[in-house]
Amino acid sequence: MSDMHITLKVWRQDGPEQKGRFEEYAAIAAPDMSFLEMLDVVNDGLEEGHKIPVSFDSDCREGICGMCGLVINGVPHGPGKGTTTCQLYMRSFADGDTITIEPFRATAFPVIRDLVVDRTAFDQIVQAGGYNSVNTGSAPDANAVLVSKDRAEE
């Protein structure tokens, strides 16, 4: 699989009281990279250029904790139905795509910096046990990504 050349339009905001703006970045990503791995690579490039990296949250990177919530091309968590941002892979996009990345925008989740929001309201619901009201069955295996035989033998 060849690398993809992607243009990112990323929401940047220096602080909760600051005005935000979109900034564009060029990214090169492998199709089997997760979306957050691609953001890590972009941040590595920004740091090498002595620029401030894009702030974003992630914790488990296994689709469990919900810390990685972003709005991608206007859709919460991106184009993958029933998936979290950390379980979204670059193969969901095409070479040459422009991807817009924003934080969740809701009064309950004020922006702290860039793509990081204050999750206090959500965390209080989770701590009270109020978010888990439906039996959804067993959880899918974390990070279950099929790898082709040819790729596995490389």
Regions found by a protein language model. Name each.
Residues 1-153:
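Signature of N-terminal electron-transfer/Fe-S-associated modules in redox systems
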